[in-house]
Amino acid sequence: MSCRDCTRKGGCVYTTFWLVRFLPVVLVSLATGWGIYAYTYELCILSIDNWPQRIIYLFIFYALLILFYTSYLRTVYTKAWKPPQKYCIEGASKATYESVKDDERQLQLFLSDIARERDLTLLVRGFDHGIRFCDKCCCIKPDRSHHCSMCEQCVLKFDHHCPWVNNCVNFGNYKYFILFLAYGFIFCIWIAATTLPSFIDFWRHEYDMNKKQYDSIDSVIQRNLKHLHTVLSNGRFPLVFLLFLSCMFSLSLSFLFFYHLYLTAKNRTTVESFRAPMIDGKYAKDAFNHGIRANYREIFGSHPLYWFLPVPSSIGDGCKFVMNDMTAMSAAAGNQVFVEMGNVPNGQSHAHPPIAQHHINLYSEQSSSASEKEIKSVDDEITERSQVSTATTASPSHDSVTA
């Protein structure tokens, strides 16, 4: 087997790399499994004697566990959404692409023709103000999509590639990702809050017992070491470690959770927060911001029943997005955007009169006919001038020949 075969899909190097990438998912699952044992047995069975309290603790624990781990699995196993087939260059179009790909101007003309023929909605432009194209996937990039080097494909509404879920966070699983962060944060807070009182009670009890044995001031260090040894040797180490893990994970999850709440409120992705999308030759960081309520509805859906459940309810198809009114008017003022007024899809609400769709087509019917008329008038003028110039030049020559 050659080195090239090893690096291909199914090869030994590729398989090893895939297993390493999946390691964080295994670690999260192992930590969750160990937490189930520690909370159920070490805390609820060994440390809590009150049956009603034990039942309440276990009921809330397992309810949060189901919501947390289901959201996590949906985030992990929901495949990243690819651009639809109509954005891809295939067949005869592929041959044309191969012939013009080295000439940027011809390539943009070719992509513009494809976008017009297939009625593609393209609001976001590249830094060169041209249509964004992925030469690896050989497809026109839909708005807000990007190529993921880890997944080796273009991904719709790409947010980031998260190693802890071994998947791209994108349009297809962004709701699950936020629910995973939310329930993970609440889950860890609940574990820490319910473990801490039992741990403190046990610590104080053992400390008082050791204090009677070591009363002299000179034996303070010895008393504390004995106390720590008692705590660990009496089976309390799982409780200590559970408290430590829950505090650590709740702290780390809180940063991610509240950051993505902010991004959702602004209708931005992580990529867009660092590099604003370019629309009409300008960076528009709030191009898709329609207000907090509408932005959250776009992610979680219109039905409150589905907001807190890891089930699909997001609005849209991941390709077409609605610009806010200010961005649309700014773009229209530059005569580069053609705006079609209508109803906001899927029940989205806005503070201002809604704009349902904004099409940027370099070769729309209106612009094409206007360009053709302008070109025809210029051609007629050039023809007229050339005829006059020819007649003027030819007259003296004719007179001299006659003479």
Swiss-Prot record:
Looking at the UniProt entry, the stretches that span the membrane are 17-37, 55-75, 176-196, 239-259
A single GO CC term for this protein reads: endoplasmic reticulum
> Which subcellular locations apply to this protein?
Membrane
Biased composition (Polar residues) is annotated at 385-403
Residues annotated as region Disordered? 365-403
Write down the membrane topology. Answer: Multi-pass membrane protein
- From its record, what is one biological process in GO terms? synaptic vesicle maturation
Name the major location: membrane
Q: Which InterPro entries match?
A: Palmitoyltrfase_DHHC, PFA4/ZDH16/20/ERF2-like
An example Pfam family from this entry, by short name, is DHHC
Corresponding gene? dhhc-4
Protein name, as recorded: Zinc finger DHHC domain-containing protein 4
Tell me one GO molecular function of this protein.
Answer: protein-cysteine S-palmitoyltransferase activity
Record keywords, A-Z:
Acyltransferase, Lipoprotein, Membrane, Palmitate, Transferase, Transmembrane, Transmembrane helix
All copies of domain DHHC, residue ranges: 132-182
